[in-house]
From Swiss-Prot:
Region feature (Disordered): 1-32, 190-218, 232-257, 271-310
Described function: Inclusion body (IB) resident protein that interacts strongly with lipid droplet (LD) proteins. Involved in LD-mediated IB clearing after protein folding stress, probably by enabling access to the IBs of an LD-stored soluble sterol derivative that acts as a chaperone in inclusion clearing.
Higher taxonomy: Eukaryota, Fungi, Dikarya, Ascomycota, Pezizomycotina
Protein name as catalogued: Inclusion body clearance protein IML2
Cell compartment(s), UniProt: Cytoplasm; Nucleus
Pfam families, per database record: Iml2-TPR_39
UniProt keyword annotations, A-Z: Cytoplasm, Nucleus, Phosphoprotein
Organism expressing this protein natively: Pyricularia oryzae (strain 70-15 / ATCC MYA-4617 / FGSC 8958)
Length: 804
């Protein structure tokens, strides 16, 4: 079995080992009175701790922590398990008190594991078949504790703690490097492949055996067939296709689609009553909407069962398996995270020795995910979070055509849909009660532009036992509601986020206000500019104003239409007041959370935005809601790359909320059109939607006009300084569309390669321009997308032999 922790840590100095050997841990239940060797005790401790930790990933941390706290003198493994449980709650919820508890618990683990490491290194070499050097199991626990404490330190609001975190990170990497070197030595001695090779070979037509002896449960791991029920402790084999397609594939596309659809359809949402105490039970509540076959990968073999001839098959001893899966999970997560750091910060990290490697990190995480233990579960969660979360923001990804023609058999490029669906299926079977996997399942549908089905699934999930998981699911629902243009659900979801999570109330209030602003504008425009009767309902004529338009009405001439008008005006008044209240409340809650002693970028964005609107309202003598220019909800769609999730119908509808006549004051429109940053916000939002609708030429015309603005006109004061950088980024996306879409290539086949080369170079130049842009509020948000784009462009250029 095994446990987890990708990147975290604690104290700033190496714990001093105790003068004498550490005390023997209290024997686990069932072995009292039995004399056990040190090796047997260690195995018992590991097994007991891992059994408890399985509950964490099944949405039941209370059971896990209750079990782990039973030990009067807990082992390093039990302390690590307890630390992981509290740590996960702290990073999922960003709650200060939970972070403090996590820091204390992880510090205890750090000290104990160091002492056990020193003690273990003094022991005689093990004679029970272990391959790793003595003490390695405690060294990896120590490294995991350092990594966890490093993450918690970074999340604290102190710059000093953040600097300590980097020191812990260096220590953890040094420990992991030594363990990795030992693993490499073992691989060479045993004549196996590199320990850092691809853990999943390309699927073949022959299926491997699905049953392993208990003592071999960690070797030759594969995923079982989709219709088999899997225990969380059972050996589960995993093989995936190496990428979305392979150049030597002979399978038919229809087979791929049918296989993947069947696997996703096989996923079911268990009833909570059936999964509260039984991790392995997969109770059925409802069928999951299937994914469209039209989004299936290019021709290539679907994920099948076969021997995953990875280096992991070499390790059969539980302690070795724990170390092997942990080092892959920890090192892999570090490599992946460091590879996604925005360019400016990555250069700084490189100076002090922190360099990421996305390809290496992903390979290591896939290798760890093959193991049915806590390390494998964490690796799986990281992989799915990366592909369905972070990669969902990326625009510059290799086309399926280029992957099929250029990728190596063991190369993971872009979004490996088949792998992810298979991994998700296994995790759902292994941990049927966990809301995390259900949320990932909904993300798959949302990524297929099936927002309605994804939203329905998120709503079916209900509240998880871990409040932090509920918060994550609710946030995903809230963002999806923005893209679905469902203003009531968008409002209610973000208001609920205030109750569930205290990371950024300013952002939650602001976006909830955006929803009610759109509802106010909807009501005003459905009225056609009409207003309501007098509030006291008197029979006399009253002239009332809605936006710019005044109407006269009398109570005695009410008919069905008048009743509807009255209802709409009542709604307009209500939503206008609510929107203004939420917008004004947002800045008052900003600044409560800081990252490395800096205010959260989105909170700075919110404060500037509201201040700008207030200034305009005062200057024009308007109410706040009437002084707002281009739709802030449309701006949120852009900042979350919502166009990538929306189908053509939703994109066309979203275009309407950007129309100038949606503003409720003509004076506001006239004023806004004089402000370059506001005009640019309107134009970039429109261009992004046009790009996703396949209307790139129209988008390019808008963006070229915006790019001609002087940067100085969009800087200073409360102006939105990110918008010109984003316009340049959008131009890069249009160039990439030209690279990847055959319908945009020259009709003369001889000219295609040169056309693609030039467009690739153009995309790279534009991305480099954005990467080197001066600091702006949302630079980190765009930085990750830019870094992913640069990596993709370099990959294609290298494969094609082009010089950038």
């Amino acid at each position: 079995m095994s446990l987890r922790s990708w990147f975290r840590g604690s104290g700033t100095t190496t714990p001093k080992s105790s003068a004498g050997p550490s005390r023997a841990t209290t024997p686990p239940s069932g072995v009292q009175g039995t004399v056990m060797t040190a090796e047997q005790q260690e195995l018992a401790d590991l097994s007991d701790a891992m059994q408890a930790m399985a509950h964490i990933m099944n949405d039941d941390p209370e059971s896990a922590e209750a079990h782990l706290r039973q030990r009067k003198d807990p082992s390093s493994f039990h302390l690590l398990g307890l630390g992981v449980s509290i740590f996960m709650r702290s990073i999922l919820g960003f709650e200060k008190d939970v972070m403090a508890e996590a820091s204390k618990c992880i510090a205890d683990c750090e000290t104990r594991s160091w002492n056990d490491k020193v003690k273990g290194e003094r022991r005689e070499p093990a004679t029970d078949g272990r391959l790793f050097p003595n003490g390695s199991e405690f060294a990896i626990v120590y490294a995991q504790a350092l990594l966890m404490n490093a993450v918690v330190s970074v999340l604290h609001e102190s710059l000093t703690d953040a600097l300590k975190a980097f020191y812990k990170l260096r220590k953890a990497m040094a420990v992991m490097s030594s363990i990795s070197a030992a693993e490499e030595k073992i691989m060479k001695e045993q004549g196996a492949s590199s320990a850092r090779g691809n853990p999943f070979e390309q699927a073949s037509t022959a299926s491997g055996s699905g049953n392993l002896a208990a003592e071999d449960e960690d070797s030759d791991l594969e995923f079982v067939d989709a219709d088999e029920k899997v225990s969380p402790e059972a050996p589960i084999h995993v093989t995936y296709d190496g990428h979305t397609s392979t150049k030597d594939s002979t399978s038919q596309p229809a087979t791929d689609a049918a296989t993947l659809e069947g696997k996703l359809q096989a996923l079911e949402i268990p009833d909570d009553s059936d999964t509260k105490s039984h991790l392995s039970k997969s109770a059925v509540e409802s069928q999951v909407p299937s994914l469209s076959a039209s989004r299936a990968p290019s021709p290539g073999p679907p994920p099948q069962l076969t021997d995953a001839a990875s280096d992991g098959s070499l390790f059969t001893h539980p302690i070795d398996i724990f170390i092997h899966s942990a080092i892959n999970m920890c090192y892999g997560s570090l490599m992946l995270v460091l590879s996604m750091v925005p360019p400016a910060f990555s250069r700084l990290l490189g100076i002090i020795g922190f360099r990421g490697d996305r390809d290496k990190g992903l390979h290591m995480l896939w290798q760890s995910a093959a193991h049915p233990n806590m390390n494998g579960a964490v690796a799986g969660l990281l992989l799915l979070g990366y592909y369905h979360g972070l990669l969902a923001f990326a625009d510059v990804l290799p086309s399926e055509r280029d992957v099929a023609e250029l990728a190596e058999p063991d190369e993971i490029v872009g979004y490996p849909r088949g792998r992810c669906i298979e991994l998700l299926r296994v995790m759902r079977e292994r941990y049927p009660a966990s809301g995390l996997w259900r949320m990932e399942q909904a993300r798959v549908l949302i990524g297929e532009k099936k927002l309605k089905e994804g939203i329905e699934m998120l709503e079916k999930c209900g509240d998880a036992k871990m409040r932090q998981v509920t918060a994550l699911s609710t946030f995903e629902l809230a963002v999806s509601s923005i893209c679905y243009l469902d203003w009531p659900r968008m409002h209610s979801s973000f208001v609920r986020m205030v109750e569930l999570n205290d990371w950024s109330h300013a952002l939650y209030y602001f976006i909830a206000g955006c929803a009610h602003l759109e509802m106010y504008r909807d009501a005003v425009h459905e009225l056609g500019g009409l207003s309501e009767l007098s509030e006291d309902g008197s029979e006399s004529e009253k002239e009332v104003k809605a936006g710019d338009v005044k109407v006269t009405a009398t109570k005695d001439r009410l008919d069905v239409e008048d009743i509807r008008k009255k209802e709409l005006i009542s709604n307009a008044r209500k939503y206008k007041k609510s929107a203004e209240t939420l917008f004004r409340k947002a800045p008052t809650t900003a600044g409560r959370k800081r990252f490395m002693a800096r205010q959260m970028p989105f909170e700075v964005f919110v404060m500037r935005k509201v201040a700008k609107w207030e200034e305009r309202a005062t200057a024009l003598k308007l109410d706040l809601a009437d002084a707002i220019g281009p739709s802030p909800a449309a701006e949120m769609i852009y900042l979350w790359n919502g166009g990538k999730r929306m189908n053509l119908e939703l994109i066309e509808k979203a275009m309407t909320i950007l129309e100038w006549d949606r503003c409720t004051s003509s004076a506001t429109v006239a004023k806004v059109k004089e402000e370059h940053d506001e005009v640019a916000i309107h134009g970039v939002g429109q261009a992004a939607l046009l790009r996703h609708a396949g209307r790139g030429d129209e988008a390019k015309g808008i963006l070229l006009d915006i790019s001609a603005y002087d940067r100085a006109t969009c800087k200073g004061g409360n102006k939105d300084d990110y918008i010109l950088a984003s316009a340049t980024y959008e131009l890069a996306m249009l160039a990439w569309d030209d690279v990847c879409r055959p319908e945009r290539w020259p009709t003369d086949a001889d000219e295609v390669e040169e056309f693609r080369r030039k467009k690739t170079e153009e995309c790279y130049t534009l991305l480099e321009t954005v990467a080197k842009w001066e600091t702006y509020v949302l630079d980190a948000r765009f930085g990750m997308r830019v870094q992913t784009g640069l990596d993709t462009v370099r990959w294609l250029s290298k494969k094609k032999g082009w010089t950038l």
